[in-house]
């Protein structure tokens, strides 16, 4: 049984931005029976493991929440969302299949065969308390050295760590298909991340339950500049390859993600 509580994290003591407030309002609208609990420095010990202590000291608050979400769900159970996730319809059918996570990106080779796939627990995940997968993730983070990885430019995202852990346990993704590993349900990309890099827009389907707006709060100014350059380079490369097909979508990507600014 999944406790009727939605967890999110907001470290750093800054005000919640308008996007986060909008997303939290959507949780209240579509999951009205759930309590919403915002975790921060006042109710979560950021010094409990070296990784979160170091990340907090470096003001990399999103990395603090990477560990925190697993600890919080392991202790309490419930649903977790990143604060840039907007729910657009009732989640009852999804929660009934918990524990669950969602695919963020899929890459395909010839004949639409998946060659890489990533699962992002920030899109939304739910579990009863004491789930062993969350314990495995907590144990992993306890071994990490944030400051060393940051210095060596070796920091990994929670998406990388989670996907690698699932694959070590035998998870094999399939395009557009709900899959399972152990007792965890993994929903395809269109369920929680309907953004299309091809069209530059959200492609909402009957299977879409939420939208991830990608606030990217963990990125430094330098990393955001690198992302900007990647988008600009991608724009001209794809425009050269297929101008009529890609121009409209790529202009929309650049405008929506504001990579020119």
Regions found by a protein language model. Give the residues of each.
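Glycosyltransferase-associated regions of secretory-pathway enzymes
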Residues: 1-65, 83-261
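Small-residue hinge/turn detector
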Residues: 66-78
């Amino acid at each position: 049984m999944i406790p009727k509580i939605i967890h999110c994290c907001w470290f750093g003591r800054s005000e919640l931005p308008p996007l986060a407030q909008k997303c939290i309002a959507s949780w209240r609208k579509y999951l009205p029976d759930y309590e919403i609990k915002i975790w921060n420095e006042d109710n979560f010990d950021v010094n409990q493991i070296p990784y979160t202590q170091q990340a907090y000291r470096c003001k990399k608050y999103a990395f603090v929440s990477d560990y925190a979400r697993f600890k919080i769900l392991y202790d309490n159970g419930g649903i977790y969302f990143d604060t840039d996730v907007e729910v657009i319809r009732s989640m009852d059918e999804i929660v009934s299949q918990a524990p669950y996570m969602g695919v963020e990106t899929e890459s395909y080779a010839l004949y639409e065969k998946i060659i890489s796939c990533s699962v992002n627990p920030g899109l939304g995940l739910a579990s009863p308390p004491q789930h062993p997968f969350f314990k495995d993730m907590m144990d992993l983070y306890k071994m990490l050295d944030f400051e060393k990885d940051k210095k060596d430019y070796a920091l990994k995202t929670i998406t990388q760590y989670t996907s690698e852990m699932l694959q070590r346990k035998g998870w094999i993704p399939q395009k557009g298909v709900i899959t399972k590993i152990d007792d965890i349900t993994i929903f395809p990309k269109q369920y929680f991340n309907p953004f299309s890099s091809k069209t530059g827009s959200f492609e909402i389907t009957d299977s879409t339950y939420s939208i991830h707006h990608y606030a990217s709060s963990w990125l430094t100014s330098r990393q955001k500049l690198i992302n900007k350059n990647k988008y600009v380079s991608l724009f001209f490369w794809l425009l050269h390859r297929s101008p009529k097909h890609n121009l409209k979508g790529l202009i929309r990507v650049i405008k929506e993600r504001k990579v020119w600014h």
